[in-house]
């Protein structure tokens, strides 16, 4: 069924089909249809971050930026859902066209620029949803907020989403907001992490529960830079790391239509780079905080590959666009077949 739906959706522009897909998935959720149309994955419970996941395969941030289809995605069999990236104030993002399919490579290039309706809209959608599974909320800074003041935007969002999130992801790795990736390095990273940690502790006292913080990083760092990030996360007492966001590289899409568009590349071409980052992090962290792997999972075996590399959980986005909900079950089955899970 998804093959037919994809053929129809792919006749539309990428962003139009994205918006229509969110509407359809959301409507299916409200009517309770999605669970009837999608085979439920096998149960593969895992405990990470003090949270109980029915399976380790989640939806990556970016697909449902505003939380408009939480119930719909929740009925497809995901072990957890991450919505956003959301910013303190609504913003339109970059000019269109800004989203490009590269079907020959099972890839997508985007330069969306954190387009979203703002954190207050997202929270209204979260509170209206019936979904009671693990929900991550991914936060970022507004385009017109200077990088030097970025921490203010992150703290505004953290304050607002804390009570409604199972965990919060801090996005410092999108390539489509100028200067954002500089927050992954040196004193900028340390200052951001310290501010987040202090606010997390204050919010935990206020709300009576500690909501884990994850940092989402880029795949384009050197091994040495990744090691420094890992050390900073441990030192600051962060709870998890998500590896990775999209890449600025173009390996695997050279010469393809739209292959030279500006923006972040996701899908199959980023798989090896992302998995390598997971391996480096796993070696540096030594189990001190969990890794959530994202990037290039277009087959079940790719999800198992991420877990074998050291991840505790995985997330899918581009693979879901190309393969549909069947990828969730395929990924769960592949992870279940790993020796260490038997």
From Swiss-Prot:
Entry GO CC: cytoplasm; plasma membrane
Enzyme class: oxidoreductase
Catalysed reaction equations from the record: (S)-dihydroorotate + a quinone = orotate + a quinol
Residues forming the catalytic site: 174 (nucleophile)
Cofactor comment: Binds 1 FMN per subunit.
SUPFAM superfamilies referenced in this protein's UniProt entry, alphabetically: FMN-linked oxidoreductases
UniProtKB keywords: Cell membrane, Flavoprotein, FMN, Membrane, Oxidoreductase, Pyrimidine biosynthesis
Gene Ontology process terms (BP): 'de novo' pyrimidine nucleobase biosynthetic process; 'de novo' UMP biosynthetic process; pyrimidine ribonucleotide biosynthetic process
Binding site for substrate: 65, 110-114, 171, 176, 245-246
Recorded metabolic or biological pathway in which this protein acts: Pyrimidine metabolism; UMP biosynthesis via de novo pathway; orotate from (S)-dihydroorotate (quinone route): step 1/1
UniProt-listed Pfam families: DHO_dh (PF01180)
Signal peptide region: none
UniProt-annotated binding residues for FMN: 61-65, 85, 138, 171, 216, 244, 267, 296, 317-318
Record-level Gene Ontology MF annotations: dihydroorotate dehydrogenase (quinone) activity; dihydroorotate dehydrogenase activity
Stored HAMAP family: DHO_dh_type2 (MF_00225)
Family of the protein in this entry: Belongs to the dihydroorotate dehydrogenase family. Type 2 subfamily.
Subunit structure: Monomer.
Role: Catalyzes the conversion of dihydroorotate to orotate with quinone as electron acceptor.
Name the record gives this protein: Dihydroorotate dehydrogenase (quinone)
């Amino acid at each position: 069924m998804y093959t037919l739906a994809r053929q129809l959706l792919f006749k539309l522009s990428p962003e139009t089909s994205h918006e229509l897909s969110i509407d359809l998935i959301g409507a299916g959720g409200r009517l309770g249809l999605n669970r009837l149309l999608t085979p439920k994955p096998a149960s593969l419970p895992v405990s990470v971050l003090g949270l109980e996941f029915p399976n380790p395969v989640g939806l990556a941030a970016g697909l449902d930026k505003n939380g408009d289809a939480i119930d719909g995605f929740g009925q497809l069999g995901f072990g957890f859902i991450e919505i956003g990236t959301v910013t303190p104030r609504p913003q339109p993002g970059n000019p269109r066209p800004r989203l490009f399919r590269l079907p020959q490579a099972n890839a997508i290039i985007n330069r969306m620029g954190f387009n979203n309706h703002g954190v207050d809209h997202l929270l209204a959608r979260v509170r209206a949803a019936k979904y009671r599974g693990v929900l991550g909320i991914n936060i970022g800074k507004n385009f017109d907020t200077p990088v030097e003041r970025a921490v203010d935007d992150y703290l505004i969002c953290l304050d607002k989403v804390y009570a409604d999130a199972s965990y919060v992801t801090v996005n410092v790795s999108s390539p489509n907001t100028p200067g954002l990736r500089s927050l992954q390095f040196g004193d900028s990273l340390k200052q951001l992490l310290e501010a987040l940690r202090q606010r997390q502790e204050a919010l935990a006292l206020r709300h009576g529960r500690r909501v884990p913080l994850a940092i989402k990083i880029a795949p384009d760092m050197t091994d040495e830079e990744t090691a420094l990030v890992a050390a900073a996360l441990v030192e600051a007492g962060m709870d998890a790391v998500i590896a990775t966001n999209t890449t600025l590289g173009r390996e695997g899409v050279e010469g393809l239509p739209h292959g030279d568009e500006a923006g972040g590349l996701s899908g199959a071409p980023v798989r090896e780079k992302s998995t390598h980052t997971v391996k480096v992090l796993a070696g540096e962290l030594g189990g001190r905080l969990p890794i959530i792997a994202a990037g290039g999972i277009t087959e079940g075996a790719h999800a198992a590959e991420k877990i074998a590399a050291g991840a505790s959980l995985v997330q899918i986005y581009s693979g879901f666009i190309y393969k549909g909900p069947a990828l969730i079950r395929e990924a769960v089955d592949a992870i279940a077949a790993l020796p260490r899970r038997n």
